[in-house]
Amino acid sequence: LALHRSRQTKECHDTHDTTTEAPGDDPAAVGARMLNAEDNRLLTGVGPDTPMGRMLRGYWHPVLRSARLEADGAPVRVGLLGQKFVAFRVTHGEVGFVDEACPHRCTSLALARNEDNGLRCIFHGWKIDVTGRVVDVPTEPRACRAAFAESVPRPRYHVRESGGIVWVCLQQGQPPAFPDFEFHALPESQRETRIAVMHCNWVQAMESVLDSAHLGLLHQGQLQRAPADASMADHVRTVFGNTQQDTAPQLEVEPQGYGFREGALRQLPDGRRYVQIREFVAPYYSLLPAAPTVARRFIVASVPIDDEWTAQWFIHFSLDGPLTPELLAERWQHAPENPDNFYENPGDIGNLWGQDREAMRNGHFSGFPGRHIFHEDFIVQEAMGPI
């Protein structure tokens, strides 16, 4: 992905160098740099037997907010990389993560009883502990139950809780190093997480976050209210205003060991240049630009559920104090309150996601007034088709 984006822009080896070359406008050269159908299939296929799927299984993935799991509570279904799982918190508080299908007859363990530090299937009573090991098979003769249970093959996945999130690595054997983001060390009052589930592949979702050019176009309706909106923080108002001044930013990419650093350079009317810098951390994390004077950070992670569905995580945290109710109200204005899917019931292509043509005639660019700014992104991503 970093290579693909660097082909589209001039690689910037000196981030302080303000002289850049304009990309060529030869249509054949531009076409040669574009993603083709074969590359697209390679990137979007995330199942266990695909190249991308095998690569992604070597990473830790956020799968649930920790708050969703209660000790001895209902298991929660989780889709990740084209497979189906259930997560559960056992009696003593530890989190388990296992294949959804019971190893006996493949019925869903989302229906299982969660008790006595394990899941017990309601069909034949087989019990699976927090590590995924089968520990009881009451349908077998007592004399051989223990040996039979031990013989049942069952993959075991790596699970860790940190930063209010349940993380999972599907790789068998030794897991990789855990991602050391700043928010892991912060108290709950200084961080919050919300998730949006959308019907498009993870690459479409991820590239939208990295794409600075659309800010002054798709989000015009949001930007137009910025100068007069007293509830909007000064640095946010500045960002919105500057992105409208130049809708064709020049992109510069600097490869890094963790991914790449991307700069979007805009020319302002007074001769200054406005630069937004994003960090991309493999395999799908985008660290959004932040004002130098603000100690708040925003990470977006585009986690593949399968080839056609994505759970996009929005991790917001403050390094210098609690996230106040007022700040969160501003950040999530017009967003549904469900933190586990603030994009629920959005509509679809059948009703054009509720687009308001009257609002468009009255000057709203996208036709989605009263919607959270991220909803505009989700809608155009879904409108591309799932792949």
Mark where each language-model region is:
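Generic detector of low-complexity/intrinsically disordered segments
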Residues: L3-R5, A37, G45, V253, ...
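Zn-dependent metallo-beta-lactamase
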Residues: E21-K84
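Short low-complexity stretches enriched in small and charged residues
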Residues: A32-G45, G53-R54, R77-V78, V86, ...
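C-terminal catalytic domain of Rieske-type non-heme iron oxygenases
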Residues: E11-A29, P48, E94, W167, ...
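Short, Lys/Arg-enriched N-terminal segments with co-localized hydrophobic residues
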Residues: A2-D14
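Rieske [2Fe-2S] iron-sulfur-binding domain
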Residues: H13, D17-A22, L64-R191, Q250, ...
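A short, structural micro-pattern
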Residues: R57, P153, R160-S162, R296, ...
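Short beta-strand or tight-loop elements
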Residues: Y59-H61, L81-Q83, P155, Y258, ...
